[in-house]
């Protein structure tokens, strides 16, 4: 899939913008604080209905307006789709082909994106919540049912934690009802995550071995707070551990086990990647991003759109070449932001160049 056209009204520092793109590589050049990242953020927001930079929608609204409108024309294998998101103080409205969508799980996945931003380099050593978010964003685009089950899980988890914080003593019968619901939704969330990580590991290791010239292997490990011996009995084991932890959870005022506490670990040649070098970290993250692209296509039959936000300067020539070779081979529409073309090596033909200045975007040329 690829985005043919994007229109922004009152988004960040863009008062009004209408732009069309190449189905291949699109490069946005400009000094810092001109709107390059805002532009990629808008594409990300149109896809996922959320920003990767802020949780406050009001920060997305142009300073002298009260509403935001984003519309995009997306070319999928199945045909052209029009997406629209409108933001105001009354909330947000999402539409597909002018039809309002009642549930996010009906909207997300229509346009898939993979974002590679500087903060992704913290994925290995950052907080566990970053790695869970990484899984949730990809799975939510690939499997809409996952978003629904995760939403139900989080709703019951909130209810259970609220009860634990307010209760003066344990009502075992009431907790048993919540435990059953939490274990049911949570087990399905974990099953989806385990299948996804197993598939992602295969793709990521293939890319990582290519980047390292066969010197390194990459493995991923989904580490659950729920102890189980096989995937088919996650529900029973989760339910048992919830019941066993009633007293501990009551004392701590929160739920001690479940997918909300699960971890994702990375290993290079069998060694925990927390102890890897900076160069190895870059190769690992690059391998993951290329694996995301490959896996989304394998599981859905359509390519995602790749957003590279000021990361090419973080990669040496070898890693840049591997990345560009992948997107060209897979025919992935790619958006790159940079302050200068000097940061990019071995650019292929057919690139569309845009210049970004103070919230305006001007097309330069197509390189043939």
UniProtKB/Swiss-Prot annotation:
UniProt keyword terms in alphabetical order: ATP-binding, Cytoplasm, DNA damage, DNA repair, DNA replication, DNA-binding, Nucleotide-binding, SOS response
Localization of this protein: Cytoplasm
Amino acids binding ATP: 30-37
One MF annotation (Gene Ontology) recorded for this entry: ATP binding
Pfam families: SMC_N (PF02463)
GO biological process: DNA replication; DNA synthesis involved in DNA repair; double-strand break repair; SOS response
GO cellular component: cytoplasm
UniProt xrefs under Gene3D superfamilies: P-loop containing nucleotide triphosphate hydrolases, RecF/RecN/SMC, N-terminal domain
Chief location category: cytoplasm
Functional description taken from the UniProt entry: The RecF protein is involved in DNA metabolism; it is required for DNA replication and normal SOS inducibility. RecF binds preferentially to single-stranded, linear DNA. It also seems to bind ATP.
Family: Belongs to the RecF family.
Protein name: DNA replication and repair protein RecF
Source organism of the structure: Streptococcus pyogenes serotype M12 (strain MGAS9429)
